[in-house]
Amino acid sequence: MRILWIVAVCLIGVEGNLYQFGKMIFKMTRKSALSYSDYGCYCGWGGKGKPQDATDRCCFVHDCCYGTVNGCDPKLSTYSYSFQNGDIVCGGDDPCLRAVCECDRVAAICFGENMNTYDTKYMLHSLFDCMEESEKC
């Protein structure tokens, strides 16, 4: 348990909202965020090619959403949010942080709605299998 806490603290330092996004993912899917950390062509660092399934498309849309955020770094931003009646509610006054939260909220909901498409064959998916031309956001 102590090692997990140390890893979580280190990950938060690397990517400010990773922990928050992970909590959203777990709330909507009951799966660890690690299940989505290296999945398909878009879940995880970077992304290229064609999304492999609806789950991977959630990550593609999430990447596109981050690309529209202006005024803060989505990967380093810590935002306000809460869980109310099974829903994720983004809060706070900063429009940029709220936009980052919305990107994460929509992706977490998307993962929950597409759990039936999650296929373990796309876990640890090689980017060499993602050589098709990338779609436009």
Curated annotation (Swiss-Prot):
Identify the cofactor(s). Ca(2+)
Q: What does this protein do?
A: Snake venom phospholipase A2 (PLA2) that is not toxic by itself, but the synergistical mixture of a basic and this acidic protein is lethal. PLA2 catalyzes the calcium-dependent hydrolysis of the 2-acyl groups in 3-sn-phosphoglycerides.
- Binding locations of Ca(2+): Y42, G44, G46, D63
Which organs or tissues contain this protein? Expressed by the venom gland.
Subcellular localization is given as: Secreted
**Active site residues of this protein:** H62, D104
Record family assignment: Belongs to the phospholipase A2 family. Group II subfamily. D49 sub-subfamily.
SUPFAM superfamilies, per database record:
Phospholipase A2, PLA2
Q: Which GO terms describe its biological process?
A: arachidonate secretion; lipid catabolic process; phospholipid metabolic process
- The superkingdom of the source organism is Eukaryota
Q: Which organism is it from?
A: Daboia palaestinae (Palestine viper)
Entry-linked PROSITE patterns:
PA2_ASP (PS00119), PA2_HIS (PS00118)
How many and how are cofactors bound here? Answer: Binds 1 Ca(2+) ion.
Disulfide topology: C41-C130, C43-C59, C58-C110, C64-C137, C65-C103, C72-C96, C90-C101
One MF term in the entry's GO annotations:
phospholipid binding
Q: Name one Pfam family in it.
A: Phospholip_A2_1
The reaction(s) this protein catalyses: a 1,2-diacyl-sn-glycero-3-phosphocholine + H2O = a 1-acyl-sn-glycero-3-phosphocholine + a fatty acid + H(+)
- Protein's name in the database: Acidic phospholipase A2 VP8
A cellular component term from Gene Ontology for this protein is: extracellular region
Entry-linked Gene3D superfamilies: Phospholipase A2 domain
Assembly and interaction partners: Does not form a complex.
Record's keyword annotation contains Hydrolase = yes
The signal peptide stretch is 1-16
